[in-house]
Amino acid sequence: MATMQLRRTASMSALVFPNKISTEQQSLMFVKRLLAVSVSCITYLRGIFPERAYGTRYLDDLCVKILKEDKNCPGSSQLVKWMLGCYDALQKKYLRMIILAVYTNPEDPQTISECYQFKFKYTKNGPIMDFISKNQNNKSSTTSADTKKASILLIRKIYVLMQNLGPLPNDVCLTMKLFYYDEVTPPDYQPPGFKDGDCEGVIFDGDPTYLNVGEVPTPFHTFRLKVTTEKERMENIDSAILTPKDSKIPFQKILMDKDDVEDENHNNFDIKTKMNEQNENSGTSEIKEPNLDCKEEEIMQFKKNQSSSISQCQVEQLISKTSELDVSESKTRSGKIFQCKMVNGNQQGQISKENRKRSLRQSGKTVLHILESSSQESVLKRRRVSEPNEHT
């Protein structure tokens, strides 16, 4: 019985991450799946979507939740479609960065309460999914075992951080922005489900603080994750799991992407102490409800020519449109009542740039500059940004 359980766990783990990464295609598949798992863990643990919007998969001793399409939760279905658009840009090596942001006013998606930054780098051999690490000198010698180990560590970091952050407001919405390597991206390119967006920055509703989560390298890709959240949500986080490089963090000037220069001024998230405490209190590393039977299609199944276990019908369901307005309520992991909403993007109230600037001056809120360059010429040149056709 124990042997069968071990085989089952190993088999399900292999469905998430391949055991071997020796080609660019295998690396691309791995990065896509790691992105899917990361987004799923974040949205699950932050209580963004109700329980039914997730399936279950296993990574060694970790039980993780994977976002899936749910007709009763249009918001999760919409995020699945966004992810498919991200995969398209990633496969073409255009994608530079994803900003997944949480906001509270459905009519003002530019004023955010929390955001997650996923940054991608591509080596000469292919792309890399990078979660911020000091060890960036041995990418060419990265083994499959090293990559898998780093991936599981990253997921554990996400798990610990998300569980210890203060709760989000009860009713929240999601938006996403995509940034590109403009020098190689065609000027008219837009991923499926996206349109031309605003590159002027977003307004942070509160006092932001910035966390480096980690990095996962492969021989072909690098993926990096950072989290920006309200300072007050950090109050319950034990200082022992934060390793600040500079105790005087300039909260009033948070830059979303200035390569690695700003990393020296941000907190690194260290989970060793917290994980040891949790392991002492519990003999399991399960995120939640490991006994759920998940037979539905998951967002990780993003390739059209996947294995025979994935039917064409499932793929079509993943990319099918969900256009109606629907509201559903469910108790989330934090005990809040969550309303899952999806509103057609054309029905969203639009706030003019002049009104936004005026409101910003009056409220004293912080502007998060998405991109900043030391080159004046680069600043004058408008960077291309994509945003979803429809918001959740």
Swiss-Prot record:
PROSITE patterns in the record: HORMA
Domain of life: Eukaryota
Record-level GO cellular component terms: chromosome; condensed nuclear chromosome; nucleus; synaptonemal complex
InterPro entries in alphabetical order: HORMA_dom, HORMA_dom_sf, HORMA_MeioticProgression
A Pfam family per the record: HORMA
Region: Disordered, residue numbers: 271-292, 371-392
Post-translational modification: Phosphorylated at Ser-375 in a SPO11-dependent manner.
Xref: SUPFAM superfamilies: The spindle assembly checkpoint protein mad2
Domain HORMA: residue ranges: 25-227
Keywords: Chromosome, Differentiation, Meiosis, Nucleus, Oogenesis, Phosphoprotein, Spermatogenesis
Gene3D superfamilies reported for this sequence: HORMA domain
Annotated localization: Nucleus; Chromosome
Chain ranges for the short sequence motif Nuclear localization signal as given in the UniProt record: 381-384
GO biological process: blastocyst development; homologous chromosome pairing at meiosis; meiotic cell cycle; meiotic DNA double-strand break formation; meiotic recombination checkpoint signaling; meiotic sister chromatid cohesion; oogenesis; regulation of homologous chromosome segregation
Modified residues (Phosphoserine): S374
Subunit and partners: Interacts with HORMAD2. Interacts with IHO1.
Described purpose of this protein according to its UniProt entry: Plays a key role in meiotic progression. Regulates 3 different functions during meiosis: ensures that sufficient numbers of processed DNA double-strand breaks (DSBs) are available for successful homology search by increasing the steady-state numbers of single-stranded DSB ends. Promotes synaptonemal-complex formation independently of its role in homology search.
Protein name: HORMA domain-containing protein 1
